[in-house]
C-alpha cells in the first residue's frame, strides 16, 4: 500500500525494450535508498513496481505488457522523470489516502488554469465509465499523488494544486495533452457499486409478476 504522498522524483536513465516487456532503470534520490532491497515495492507515477536490481542509486524495475498498456509508463523516454514513493509501513503517517498502486486508466490534461499561488488542471478520463467514481471533494490518485477532486462534469474533473505540490512532483511540468495515471479511491468505488447493486435488486423485485407498487 501507498499513502499518495510523493517522496521524490526519479530520472529514467535507461530502458531495455523487449517484445511486450520492458526493464527500466531510474536514479532514486539518496533518501529513498535506506533499507531498499530487491523485491521491494516502489510506486512510479502511482503504479506499483518491484525492484529487480540495485546498483548504487540506479534501481531496475520490470514492466509487463499489461502495465505498459494501461499506464503512462510505456510512454516514458530516457531523461523523463517519474513520481516515486516506497511502500508504506505500519508506523507511517497516512498524509494522503491509502492507495494500492493499481492503475485503472489514464487521463489527458485538457485544460490548465494558472494564478499567482495555485494551478487548476482539468483532466479527461480515457475510460468514461469510471467517471461515476469521481465525486466532488472525493479522493483520487493522479500519477501517485493523493488529491482532492474539485469540480466534476460528465466527462471531466479538475484538481487544485498548491505551489508545494507543483514543486515536489511532476504535475508542475505537465502540458496539454499529457497522460497521467488514475487510481480511483477504492472506498468510493465500493460505495457506488453497492448502491448500484441495491437499486438494481430493488428494481428487479418491483418488476416481478405479482409485486405491488
UniProtKB/Swiss-Prot annotation:
Gene3D superfamilies: 2.40.30.20
Pathway info: Cofactor biosynthesis; riboflavin biosynthesis; riboflavin from 2-hydroxy-3-oxobutyl phosphate and 5-amino-6-(D-ribitylamino)uracil: step 2/2
EC number: 2.5.1.9
UniProt keyword annotation of Transferase present: yes
GO biological process: riboflavin biosynthetic process
Keywords: Repeat, Riboflavin biosynthesis, Transferase
Binding sites annotated in the UniProt record for 2,4-dihydroxypteridine 2: 48-50, 62-67, 101-103, 137
Annotated binding of 2,4-dihydroxypteridine 1, by residue: 4-6, 146-148, 160-165
One Gene Ontology MF term: riboflavin synthase activity
Gene Ontology CC terms, in alphabetical order: cytosol
Placement of Lumazine-binding repeats on the sequence: 1-97, 98-195
Catalyzed reactions: 2 6,7-dimethyl-8-(1-D-ribityl)lumazine + H(+) = 5-amino-6-(D-ribitylamino)uracil + riboflavin
Protein origin, superkingdom: Bacteria
Matches recorded under PANTHER family: RIBOFLAVIN SYNTHASE, RIBOFLAVIN SYNTHASE ALPHA CHAIN
Function, as annotated: Catalyzes the dismutation of two molecules of 6,7-dimethyl-8-ribityllumazine, resulting in the formation of riboflavin and 5-amino-6-(D-ribitylamino)uracil.
Oligomeric form and interacting partners: Homotrimer. Unlike in B.subtilis, does not interact with 6,7-dimethyl-8-ribityllumazine synthase.
Protein name: Riboflavin synthase
Classification of source organism: Bacteria, Pseudomonadati, Pseudomonadota, Gammaproteobacteria, Enterobacterales
Amino acid at each position: 500500500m501507498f499513502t499518495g504522498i510523493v517522496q521524490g522524483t526519479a530520472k529514467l536513465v535507461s530502458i531495455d525494450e523487449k517484445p511486450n516487456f520492458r526493464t527500466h532503470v531510474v536514479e532514486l534520490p539518496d533518501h529513498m535508498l535506506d533499507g531498499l532491497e530487491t523485491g521491494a515495492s516502489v510506486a512510479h507515477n502511482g503504479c506499483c513496481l518491484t525492484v529487480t536490481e540495485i546498483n548504487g542509486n540506479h534501481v531496475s524495475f520490470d514492466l509487463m505488457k499489461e502495465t505498459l498498456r494501461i499506464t503512462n509508463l510505456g510512454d516514458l523516454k530516457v531523461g523523463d522523470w517519474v513520481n516515486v514513493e516506497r511502500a508504506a509501513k505500519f508506523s507511517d503517517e497516512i498524509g494522503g489516502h491509502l492507495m494500492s498502486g493499481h492503475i485503472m486508466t489514464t487521463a489527458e490534461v485538457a485544460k490548465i488554469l494558472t494564478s499567482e499561488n495555485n494551478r487548476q488542471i482539468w483532466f479527461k478520463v480515457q475510460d468514461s465509465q469510471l467517471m461515476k467514481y469521481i465525486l466532488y471533494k472525493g479522493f483520487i490518485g493522479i500519477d501517485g499523488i493523493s488529491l482532492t477532486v474539485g469540480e466534476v462534469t460528465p466527462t471531466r474533473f479538475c484538481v487544485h494544486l498548491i505551489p508545494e505540490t507543483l514543486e515536489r512532483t511532476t504535475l508542475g511540468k505537465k502540458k496539454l495533452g499529457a497522460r497521467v495515471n488514475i487510481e480511483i479511491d477504492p472506498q468510493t468505488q465500493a460505495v457506488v457499486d453497492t448502491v448500484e447493486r441495491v437499486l438494481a435488486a430493488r428494481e428487479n423485485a418491483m418488476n416481478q409478476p405479482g409485486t405491488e407498487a
